[in-house]
Amino acid sequence: MLKDNPLIFLTVTFLTAWSASYNAMSQTERTQPQLSAIIDSLEEQDQKWRHLWTLVHNHQSTGSLTEGEILLNLRQTDSLNFFTLKKIIGEIGYPAIAEVGSTSSKNFWLLVQHQDRHPEFQGRVLKLMKVAVDAGQAYAEDYAYLLDRVLINTGQLQVYGTQMVLDSTKTSFKPKPVSDMVNLNARRKYVGLPSIEIYIQEMNERYHEFLTSDK
């Protein structure tokens, strides 16, 4: 199953890596610690099953859990999280850094990134997140990832080149179709992302097992 769905694995592992770096950050002071705890608990379950999915791909032990059981739990977790995320958005809008802290704010973004089965919801969150970014209450680089995700999921050109795919030779990753490729690096720099060349290099190093030269 995993060999037939390499892009699913790439999405899982790439976002897992982002989550790990985010959780290393110190949580800023927050006015809604209970909401922060809820978001973090959702993220914990999210990452639990994505970590196990990564172990399966790397042919490492997952105890008594089978690949099918892990994938089922991963999908069920995403489905259950959707209802909680939707409730949070409906009640307070996008969780601001001042409300839930920097880590929980990023965790919320990460959870929304995983809601590809609900592109309309992702689009709704995107609009609210833009307001938060403009107010300094969410991170521009996170917004860039979600914007690209929404655009690609709705058949449009991405803006920041964050969504990747293997090239035709399967020797390197490349960004999925981007609008105004000439000014891509300027846009990436503006929101705090590295150049597309560095990003491609990082992807190739991180997911080298998917490249033809490593098989």
Residue spans for each PLM region:
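Short, surface-exposed acidic
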Residues: 96-98, 195-201
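Low-complexity, Gly/Ser/Thr/Pro-rich intrinsically disordered linker/tail segments
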Residues: 202-206
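Intrinsically disordered, compositionally biased glycine-rich interaction modules
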Residues: 208-215
